Swiss-Prot record:
It is an enzyme of class 1 (oxidoreductase). Heme binds at residue 442. Its cofactor is heme. It comes from Mus musculus. Induction: P450 can be induced to high levels in liver and other tissues by various foreign compounds, including drugs, pesticides, and carcinogens. GO terms for cellular component: endoplasmic reticulum membrane. This is Cytochrome P450 3A25.
């Protein structure tokens, strides 16, 4: 039996030529960083360094910093990515050269109509969307929206009390996931879902489906390894976002808009109405107003950016408070002083709680919402002696930056005092960036912080959280691309109304 197939010379030539071309494609960009004198892990043909993500992007970034220092290069398939942890260069990338060179995030896609979302849009379209949407997130608008958010904080407390009375440990993600979903649906669309008690609600189901990303999903891998397939996928109407969810939200926004126009509801205070108002503003140029498709794209991004990130952040704060009872007690004391006799929280009271702000900031340092920031270089540029070719993705690894012992003494420890009034002014804004920095930072930062703080106040006014047998200590981080704990955070919740037992 012959081991080598009996093929014609022409077939062999074609086969060998194909393999050579395939190898050239899989390695043509992989010499870039070596040529520039930038260290980094050795890439594999075609794959680059993507298999190094097996233990998680955050772990890969942390390991690279320890091995290579503040600057290193690696490859996702053929795409060169330059990692930067130097605060001076970070400032230039995110702020000084934002408009001229580093305006855009990496286009990762096919994404369908989500190209029109503020987080994905580019250059002039992004500037236009940012200009139109920024007034929606001002302190004044959020203050108007606060009563809507507070009602969901009250529902959170009721749901938590009902769970606490069962006497069983509670999954934080279940409770706070429902709260986050309710806040987003209520403030975005004026819809009351009560997602904890109505998990089969189509709104909840379609929203959760958007968030199911796996780093080694074959479809995503094909986009990373063969980026030239993206326009083909777009022609075939493929998308990294689930089609049924996208169609649901397109139709939903269209229906809601139609109903509001028919009933002349112009005084509602939610994001959909505020976006609709851009279409009707007298001083607004017609070509600048948001289209219906753009409104749908922003609505999906609010869900995508708000639901999972907010609920995970609150869950992690509760974990740290449960494992640091002294911090929890100090925070409860501040809440009780500010809101005696469980008085309803006000916007101004929430904004004035200094220790609450310290606790939230420290938790976001340890567990940043986004573990990476990315910008694409629009042209060749040299920054502080580092040459960055056009098309290179500049990546800022937030996780190791927030835990860098050069900037943070005992970086693995939970210590809210780092963010006290005395210390906060000494923190470089380019080493602490839970919501990014510069003109393209997270537009929903204030909204997210209010949502988080409102939940923390509601819980600690009424309950004390404690670790239990099911609590994973120490906490381990998942290897999935969306930052989350490896296992659900399970805690015991005890009502503060119950009389204390024992001495």
């Amino acid at each position: 039996m012959e081991l080598i197939p009996n093929l014609s010379i022409e077939t062999w030539v074609l086969l060998v030529t194909s393999l050579v071309l395939f190898y050239i494609y899989g390695t043509y960009s992989h010499g870039l960083f070596k040529k520039l004198g930038i260290p980094g892990p050795k890439p594999l043909p075609l794959l680059g360094t993507i298999f190094n993500y097996y233990d998680g992007m955050w772990k890969f970034d942390e390991d690279c910093y320890k091995k290579y220092g503040k600057i290193w290069g690696f490859y996702e398939g053929p795409q060169p990515i330059l990692a930067i942890m130097d605060p001076e260069i970070i400032k230039i990338v995110l702020v000084k050269e934002c408009y001229s060179v580093f305006t855009n995030r990496r286009f990762f896609g096919p994404v369908g109509f989500m190209k029109k979302a503020i987080t994905i849009s580019e250059d002039e379209e992004w500037k236009r969307l940012r200009t139109l949407l920024s007034p929606t997130f001002t302190s004044g608008k959020l203050k108007e929206m606060f009563p809507i958010m507070r009602q969901y904080g009250d529902i959170l407390v009721r749901n938590l009390r009902r769970e606490e009375e069962k006497g069983e440990p509670i999954s934080m993600k279940d409770i706070f996931g429902a709260y986050s979903m309710d806040v987003i649906t209520g403030t975005s669309f004026g819809v009351n879902v009560d997602s904890l008690n109505n998990p089969q609600d189509p709104f909840v189901q379609k929203a959760k489906k958007i968030l199911k990303f796996k780093i080694f999903d074959p479809f995503l891998l094909s986009i990373i390894l063969f980026p030239f397939l993206t326009p083909i996928y777009e022609m075939l109407n493929f998308s990294i976002f689930p089609r049924d969810s996208m169609n649901f939200f397109k139709k939903f926004v269209k229906r809601m808009k139609k109903e509001r126009l028919a009933s002349n509801q112009k005084n509602r205070v939610d994001f959909l109405q505020l976006m609709m108002n851009t279409q009707n503003s007298k001083g607004q140029e017609s070509q600048k107003a948001l289209s219906d498709l753009e409104m749908a794209a922003q609505a999906v991004i609010f869900i995508f950016g708000g639901y999972d990130a907010t609920s995970t952040s609150i869950s992690l704060i509760m974990y740290e408070l449960a494992t640091h009872p002294d911090v929890q007690k100090k925070l409860q004391d501040e809440i009780d002083r500010t809101l005696p006799n469980k008085a309803p929280v006000t916007y101004d009271a929430l904004m004035d709680m200094e220790y609450l702000d310290m606790v939230v900031n420290e938790s976001l340092r340890l567990y940043p919402i986004a573990i990476r920031l990315e910008r694409v270089s629009k042209k060749d540029v040299e920054i502080n002696g580092v040459f960055i070719p056009k098309g290179t993705v500049v990546m800022i690894p937030i996780y190791p930056l927030h835990r860098n012992p050069e900037y943070w003494p005992e970086p693995q420890e939970f210590c809210p005092e780092r963010f006290s009034k005395e210390n906060k002014g000494n923190i470089d804004p380019y080493i602490y960036m839970p919501f990014g920095n510069g003109p393209r930072n997270c537009i929903g930062m204030r909204f997210a912080l209010i949502s988080i703080k409102l939940a923390v106040i509601g819980v600690l006014q009424n309950f004390t959280v404690q670790p239990c047998e099911e609590t994973q200590i120490p906490l381990k981080i998942s290897r999935e691309p969306i930052f989350q704990p490896e296992k659900p955070i399970i805690l015991k919740v005890v009502s503060r109304d119950k009389p204390r037992t024992g001495s």
